Amino acid sequence: MTTPTTTAPITIETRVGAGKVEIFRCDRRAEEVTIGNAGGDVASLDGYTLHDEGSRHSIDLGQFGSLRPAQILVVTTGETASAEGDRVIWKTEDIWNNDGDTAVLIAPDGSAVSLPC
């Protein structure tokens, strides 16, 4: 006699939390800012914004969803901006090309991390 077996459905849950979203690089010549998740969990970009020094230009990063651990998002600007792979186009005008400009990443809690370009 065979005993029937049942298998409960498997639920895979992706944990999205604060993660550890950071600015990894700001390249004023290439007009690129690289944002990445340095944490061990998926990090939602909801509530994160990126702006230049003086806040003349600002972008809501939440529109790009979330980042897996070690995943990057390259925010491109300028005439040669492109959206391939992990790259997204912010603007087709130069943002970071002036001397002494700074990329500022604002977290949902209002804390800021900045990196000179």
Give the role of each language-model region.
Residues 1-117:
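Activation on beta-sandwich/Ig-like modules and their edge loops
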